Every structure is written in C-alpha cells, then in structure tokens.
From Swiss-Prot:
SUPFAM superfamilies: gp5 N-terminal domain-like (SSF69255), Phage fibre proteins (SSF69349), Phage tail proteins (SSF69279). Disruption phenotype: Deletion leads to a complete loss of PldA, PldB and VgrG4b secretion. It comes from Pseudomonas aeruginosa (strain ATCC 15692 / DSM 22644 / CIP 104116 / JCM 14847 / LMG 12228 / 1C / PRS 101 / PAO1). Belongs to the VgrG protein family. Keywords: Secreted. Its main location: secreted. Residues 753-790 are annotated as: Disordered. This is Type VI secretion system spike protein VgrG5. Part of the H2 type VI secretion system (H2-T6SS) specialized secretion system, which delivers several virulence factors in both prokaryotic and eukaryotic cells during infection. Allows the delivery of the phospholipase effector PldB to target cells where it exerts its toxicity. Also plays a role in VgrG4b and its effector PldA secretion. PANTHER family: PROTEIN RHSA-RELATED, PTHR32305. The keyword Secreted applies.
Length: 790
C-alpha cells in the first residue's frame, strides 16, 4: 500500500553534513549512455546555510519508503525566498560523470583499446576502479594505434568512443554511492526486482505502483549497412564489409553506406557494420509509457504483466525515464513556489514517463557525438629518439609533436607514424625527402580526421632559417642538405636567376656519380675549367674523337706513358720539335725509316752525318768503317698501363603502378549459410534465442535466431569449423564440407538431426505430448534423466 498522503515520501541525504532539508519537488531525467540530472526544490528552517560547502557534496535522493533512490553529487545550489519559518532552495543532483562535461582537452592516446582509454579518462577525474566497471561480452576490442581527443570535452570524447564501438553505459545506485557500468550486450542490464502490472489509468488509485499507460510504435530503419576503407599497406585489397537482414525479411532494402569505415581488417569491418545495423534497429520497435513505480530506472529491464495484449507481457529495456515528484505537505506556510499551487493535473505524489525497447533488440547508443574535424592544417615539430636527427620507418613516415600536445616528451613516442606527401611517388621511383628531427612541418588530416594526420610540407621559422638570407637572395632556388650524422657537410643544388648572374651551382660533399644509359652532349658557350685534386681515370670502350680549333697546351710535371695497341699516326702541319733532357730511344721490331724531303742530319759528340741533294757528308775527328766496337744501347720502353676507373653507383628501374580497383556492378549477393538449431528433429527450441557464433574457436558475431530457430550468416573464407551457442544453454558444432550447396538428400537429413541407423536404445524417453519435447529442449538438464527403456 502507498503511504498516507500526509506523510513525506521523498527525502535527501547529504553525506558528512547535517541539515534539515525537506524535498518539496523534483524533476529528473536519466537515460542509457547519458548522465542523469535531477532538479530539486528544497525547503529548510535555516536561512544561513553555507551554500559553498554544500556544492559537490555526495547526496542520495530517496524516491520511495522502501529506500530506493538516486545517488549523485550536488553540482548546483541556490537559495531563494524566505517565509516566516521556511526558506526555499534549489539544487541539482548529477553523477560524477557530469563533471567530465566541464573539462575539455587535446591529447593523444596510443596503442590502447577503447576500454583502456575510458579507464584512463575516468581515473584522471578521480573515478577509480571501485566506481566503474566493464561488463563486456567476448567481443575483442583491438588497441587503437592512435586516438586523439581534439577540442572536445572529456565527456563528449568518452561518449564518442562508446558510440563508435557500440558500448553503452548506465548507473547503478545505492545509498552509499553510484557505479558507472559499461556493457556491450543485454546481459549487463539488471532486471527490476518485481514485475509491474499494467492497469489502465481510470483516475483511481491502485494499491501498488502500476504502469498506467503503455503504447508501442514501429519505425522504418535502415536494413543494411556497408562500410569501406583503404589501407595503404594493403593497397590491392578492397576493404569492404557489409551486414544485412536475415534472409526472407519483409522490408525494403535501405542501405547505410559510409567511407571511411575506420578498419584495416575485414573481420573488424564486419564487426563494425554489424554494430551499426544494430544501432539502426535498436529503436525500430519502441514503447512509451507512464507509471507511478519509483523503482523504474534506465538501464534496467522492466517485466510488464497483466497487459491485455499478451506478447507485450515481456521484458522491456528502459532506455529513458523522466521522474517527477511533489509533496506540498512539507510546506507549513506559503512561500513563492510553483509546487505549492501544483502544475496541471499533477499536484502530489510521484510519476514517471519512460521509453523502452524489447529485450531482444540489442541496445546501441546513437551517434550523437560526431568525430571532431580539424579545419585546415596544423604545424608540428618532427621528433625522434635522443641523439637522432633522422627518424623514419620503411615507408618514410615520421613522428611529430603538435604544439597543442601538453603530454608529449619530444621523443619517438609523441605520435603515430605520419605519412609524408611527395610531389611525385611511384613504384620505386619518385621523390623522397624525409623531414628531419627538429623541422617544423605542415600537417594535414584526411577528411579532417585528427586520427589520420599526414605531413604535407616543411616550414622555416626564426631559428630554422633559409639557406641564404632573404630578400637579398630572392632569385635563388635552393635544395640543400645536411650531412648525417653530426652535420658539418652538405650537398646542394642552387639555381640563380638574377639577370646577368644566372647560375646552376652543384656541391657534392663527397662523391658524384652519374649513369647515362645513352648519349651525353655538353656545350659550353665560353670557358671550361676542370680541377681534379686527385687522380683522374677515364675509359673509352670505343673510339675517342677530339678536335681542338686552337692551340693545345699540355704540361706534364711527371712522366707520360702512352701504350698504343696498333699503329700510332702523327700528322704535323709544320714542324715537330722534341727535346729530351737525357735520351731519346727509337726501337722497331722490323725496321725504322727516317725520311726527309731535303735534308737529314744526325749529330752527336761533335760529329755529324748529313744527307742532302749534294750527297752524304760525314764529319768527325775520325771516320771508322768496319773497325769493330759496338752500338750505343737505349734505355728501352717501360710504359705503365693505366688503372681502370671505378663504376658509378647503379640504380634499378621502377615498376608498373597498381591502378584503381574496378568496381563490380551488379555483383550477385553473398550466399548465406543457414542453420536450423534444434536438439531434436522438428523441435524449434531456439526461436528468438540470442546466439553467439564462433569460427575455429574465435568469436565472430552474435545475433538472435528467427521465429523458426534458424540463423544465417556469410561463410568466412577458409573457416570450416563453426560453433553456435544459444542463450538457453545449447551448443552446436558444425563441420563444413568443401561445397555446402552440393549436399545429397541423406546429408540434408543428417544436418536436420536424423540418422539412417536403428538405435539399440531410444534416444529419448517418450513424452506424453508434443509440447513436452519443446519444453524439455528449451531447458537442457531439467528434462527427465531416467534410463530409457528398450
């Protein structure tokens, strides 16, 4: 029975504080995946309460004589008018989670899963492990390589992550505190202690709290979800995943297609598309009602009873509850309050309005917190390990620290790897310039997503100045590097465009290698100066042809060695003049011919021999013919062979590029596997039962069987062994054959549970009626376990 009208039903307890507050009225709203808020109207005999001391105090609002209520913290307190004895106050009761809505941040989380990120955010606000818990199913939540909170409150960030993953949260209350519960399936929602009967509101007061109004509405929702993404590490793989309705569903084909789907593995994409479809379908069937049962709380299952429409007498998940209470009997005098006069037809007592969904519809929070967008580009500084000036991976990606990042330590853990844009990029060809540690870079974001940064260029600033002072050298275009490690050297290409001083300057700190596969043609319009400070090596593997139109002046400050494999031909227009400081030695293997048109003279030692048109003249102190003696001996030829030049560095040609992936238009839909779950032939015990599907021991998906106890899903490539577990305790093992469509008649009967042999003993004890088979099949372990009779 309800308490008498002159008794107070509602009260407020404030921890560690003595007060005489009485609750005059309250209005509150609480919903799944949202912080609750209760606005309270209070009265007190004291008009001098320390309002500042009341702020942030834990408090418990009691809603019924049985002690049920809502626990939170006082986030607002205000004093109103005073009467002869009572003073009015207004207060707001919210969870500790609400404080996160007042804190905004910009920070980076790396290599953490969503539950781990949520835990860090909560514990950063003093909401420790005893004040929150995760009740998650077997679905794995992979670590996010890079997750950014950007220009959003901590509450919005936490809510967004939950919405993206399909995780919901609700609060559970006690007089000592409130606990934040995260879940991803229906098992995390508790059931209210007792059913609540439906009694149509006829203006009469029931003996017990009841549901006075209850209505159901169906809405059209998307029936199919498709997600697509791109992974630069797997560019040839089309990243697409889809999830659709059960076969045979009578509904229009309404597709929700989105790119990017934010996944790099198809299994992850399939999971996200499944969760997205569940989000669309979560409220396609929705109930709204009104009751005076104060135990109704969002995130709890309501058991409805006594409704004339029998199928509605079932479990309903309360997704939103609006609470309202008034007890004007606490007033012993008139003060300025709307509650004293009442509003509308509600003047005293408690009532609520609620929204609910069927227990079989998986609740997924709607996407109310979109991912923040970065408008335009940002600047950052390239980072790396201590002492390192170039830090990159195999793709030329770098790490940076943004100027808004307060937690970064300017090392190799400040960010994810950022791809670096190039003005040209192909398969083993294009342009590469790795930004170095300490450089300021311009960072863009794919589709404005702060989780997908990439470097688009580098910037100079007052410390990192340009190679040549500006604007004095504004006509110079420069590409200049710095030697690694340690600096002190550089390579440079400089182009000067100033009129009359045009120049291309090249500096190689060490080696210069050229590879020209065909011709090289060089024209020098004026002079050419070559200075080689070491040895010079040249090799011509064919002819060398050279023409000098003026004098050629060659000075050798050491020996000259010339080796000619065949003949040496010299043609001199006027004269040849050779002077040797010591010796000239001519030697021929066969003959030496010296020919002169007019005169030939041999001179040495004061003697000479001259041949001219006048005859042969021999002149010397003594001319001896056949008088013995020996000829002079020359030093001989000792020509040294040249060393071979070293080869220039080689480089390989690039490969053919991978083109865009052609789309298959009108492609036949993916065939589905359909299993009818039944422990016995003809017994549909799994109708509308939640199930979980495992492939080769790994969890893949979950859902609800149809009215006939059947489930359908896309076969997974390479997966042959499936296990299906239903909520009523049954488990089914399925081993796939190579061609599931090519089954013989006996195979199809075997899949339905029939066998082609006669059992020595009955497989089950005969039951008295067909319904008994279904009843026992739906309660494994509860059936008769007596030994069957032959």
């Amino acid at each position: 029975m309800f308490a008498p009208a002159n008794q107070t039903h509602f009260s407020l307890r404030i921890e560690n504080l003595r007060h005489d507050f009485q609750v005059l009225a309250f209005r509150g709203r609480e919903a799944i995946s949202q912080p609750f808020r209760f606005d309270l109207e209070l009265v007190s005999e004291r008009s001098d309460l320390d309002l500042d001391a009341l702020l942030h105090q834990p408090a418990f609002l009691i809603l019924s004589p049985s002690g049920q209520g809502v626990h939170g913290q006082l986030t607002s307190i205000a004093q109103g008018d005073s009467g002869k004895r009572l003073t009015g106050y207004r207060a707001t009761l919210e969870p500790r989670l609400a404080y996160l809505g007042l804190c905004s941040d910009q920070r980076i989380f790396q290599r953490l899963s969503v539950p781990e990120i949520i835990g860090r955010v909560l514990e950063g606000h003093g909401i420790l492990a005893d004040a929150y818990r995760f009740q998650l199913g077997p679905t794995p939540y992979p670590a996010r390589e890079y997750c950014t909170q950007y220009d959003e409150t901590d509450l919005a960030f936490l809510s967004r992550l939950c919405e993206e993953e399909g995780i919901h949260y609700h609060h559970e209350f006690s007089a000592q505190g409130h606990v934040l519960v995260f879940g991803d399936d229906q098992t995390s929602f508790p059931r209210l202690q007792r059913p609540v009967a439906y009694v149509q509101d006829a203006g009469l007061v029931a003996d017990q709290p009841v549901v006075k109004r209850f209505g159901v509405r169906f809405d059209t929702r998307a029936s199919r979800v498709t997600r697509r993404d791109y992974d630069f590490e797997q560019p040839a793989l089309q990243m697409q995943a889809a999830h659709g309705p059960q076969p045979g569903a009578q509904q229009p084909d309404l597709e929700d297609y989105d790119y990017p789907g934010r996944f790099t593995h198809r299994e992850r994409g399939k999971h996200l598309s499944h969760r997205a479809l569940e989000r669309h379908r979560a409220d396609y069937l929705q109930a709204r009602g009104e009751s005076d049962e104060p135990a109704l709380l969002s995130g709890h299952f309501l058991t409805l009873s006594a409704h004339p429409r029998g199928e509605w007498n079932d479990l309903w998940l309360l997704t939103e509850v609006l609470h309202e209470g008034r007890q004007p009997q606490v007033l012993e005098e008139s003060i300025d309050s709307d509650v004293a006069q009442g509003q509308g037809d509600f003047r005293q007592g408690y009532r609520n309005h609620f929204v609910a969904t069927p227990w079989s519809a998986h609740f997924r929070p709607p996407l109310e917190h979109p991912r923040p967008r970065v408008l335009g580009c940002q600047t950052a500084v390239v980072t790396g390990p201590a002492g390192e000036t170039i830090h990159c991976d195999q793709y030329g990606r770098v790490k940076v620290q943004f100027f808004w990042d307060r937690l970064g330590q300017a090392d190799d853990n400040t960010s994810c790897w950022l791809r670096v844009a190039s003005n040209w990029g192909g398969k083993r060809y294009g342009g590469v310039a790795i930004p170095r540690v300490g450089m300021e870079v311009l960072v863009g974001f794919l589709e404005g997503d702060p989780d997908q940064p990439l470097v688009t260029g580098c910037l100079y600033h007052s410390e990192n100045r340009v190679p040549y002072e500006l604007p004095q050298n504004k006509t110079r275009s420069v590409f200049k590097t710095d030697s690694y490690p340690g600096g002190g050297g550089f390579n440079e290409l400089r182009i000067e465009d100033r009129k009359g001083q045009e120049q291309i300057f090249v500096h190689a700190q060490r080696d210069w290698d050229e590879n020209i596969e065909h011709d090289q043609k060089i024209r020098v319009g004026h002079e050419r100066h070559d200075t080689v400070e070491g040895d010079s090596y040249s090799e011509f593997r064919a002819e060398e042809q050279r023409t000098v139109h003026a004098d050629r002046k060659v000075e050798l400050k050491a020996a000259d060695h010339l080796s000619v494999a065949d003949a040496l031909h010299l043609r001199i227009g006027t004269g040849q003049f050779v002077e040797a400081g010591d010796e000239i030695h001519f030697k021929a293997g066969d003959k030496v011919v010296i020919e002169a048109g007019m005169e030939l003279t041999l001179k040495g030692g004061g003697s000479f021999a001259r041949l001219d048109p006048g005859g042969v003249t021999l002149d010397g102190a003594q001319v001896m013919i056949n008088s013995g003696g020996s000829p002079g001996i020359g030093s001989g030829v000792r020509a040294l062979s040249p060393l071979q030049p070293l080869a220039a560095d080689a480089a390989a040609a690039g490969g053919a590029l991978l083109g865009a992936i052609a789309q298959k238009i009108g492609e036949a839909p993916q065939k589905l596997l359909r299993f009818e779950l039944s422990p016995l032939p003809g017994v549909a015990s799994a109708a509308r039962q939640p199930y979980r599907l495992y492939a080769n021991g790994a969890f893949k998906e979950e859902g609800i069987a149809d009215e006939g106890g059947a489930i359908s899903f896309e076969p997974l490539p390479g997966e042959r062994t499936y296990r299906i577990e239903t909520a009523n305790g049954h488990a089914y093992e399925v081993e796939m054959v190579d061609q599931p469509d090519a089954l013989q008649a006996d195979d199809r009967l075997a899949q339905q549970g029939f066998r082609d042999y006669r059992a020595e003993m009955p497989q089950h004890k005969p039951r008295s009626a067909p319904d008994a088979y279904r009843r026992d099949a739906s309660r494994p372990g509860a059936a008769d376990k007596d030994e069957p009779t032959p």
